[in-house]
Amino acid sequence: AIAAGVILLWMGAAVRRLITEKGRRGRIVYRFVLTVVCTVLTVYAGFSLLWGVNYYAESFQEQSGVYARESTPEELARVTEYFARQLAGCADQVQRDENGLFAESRADIFAHSVRVFDGIYDEFPCLVMEDRVPKGVRFSTALSAMDFTGFYFPFTGEANLNIDSPACYLPSTIAHEMAHQRGIASEQECNFIAIAASTTAQSPAYRYSGWLMGFTYLSNALYRADQEAWKQVRVLLPDTVVADLRDNSAYWA
């Protein structure tokens, strides 16, 4: 916000000089364009140094030895069913409102974030680092308009989260952005890490959100592969989980 304010003030000053210093307009425009170009190049260079290099670094698969492979529809159905049963089993462990929707405090979710990776450090020591509490974005409705649930900002090293969207996915999304803080560039790898961390966390909210995120991706893939198998798995979900899924779909529609 401060940076945006500085840019607006600088642009306002440039416009004012164009109006008041008519004899020097050419020089003012030249300096304005030069400053913009230099600023863009500096930001690009900073982004490349602070984040872009991660696209060429050793991937999480290479660091961990866990590699993705193609699965059969039968394997996909079995794993999706497993996630559905785990999700159903922890659905009543989280706070809910009068409509049966996930109602855990966002403040508590953020507070518990610094311990979410503890359960997978032994298995994945490449992820060990000291965590900081991520930040909720004040203008989250703007993020929603752009279909963003969160983002990692490499210039500050902060994980920034949308706090306007349904909270049931907030814990696992926090874990996803915290995976980016560990230098993991791949979105799919960050999803895997987020699900692994969340489902083994001490916090019921994180466990539920982790199983929910995993089920969502698996269920979508199963629907594309075998709709009959998808229907058999879908009926395993309790009404509370279905309510969360529908609420999330309605929000993003």
Where do the protein language model's features map onto the residues?
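Pan-zinc metallopeptidase signature
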Residues: 239-253
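Post-HEXXH active-site segment of zinc metalloproteases
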Residues: 186-214
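Internal/C-terminal transmembrane anchor helices
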Residues: 27-54
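Membrane-interfacial, low-structure loops and terminal tails that flank and connect transmembrane helices
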Residues: 17-30
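Active-site recognition of the HExxH zinc-binding catalytic motif
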Residues: 170-196
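Membrane-embedded alpha-helical segments of integral membrane proteins
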Residues: 1-18
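Membrane-interface segments at or immediately adjacent to transmembrane helices
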Residues: 52-119
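Auxiliary, metal-adjacent structural segments of Zn-dependent hydrolase domains
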Residues: 94-167
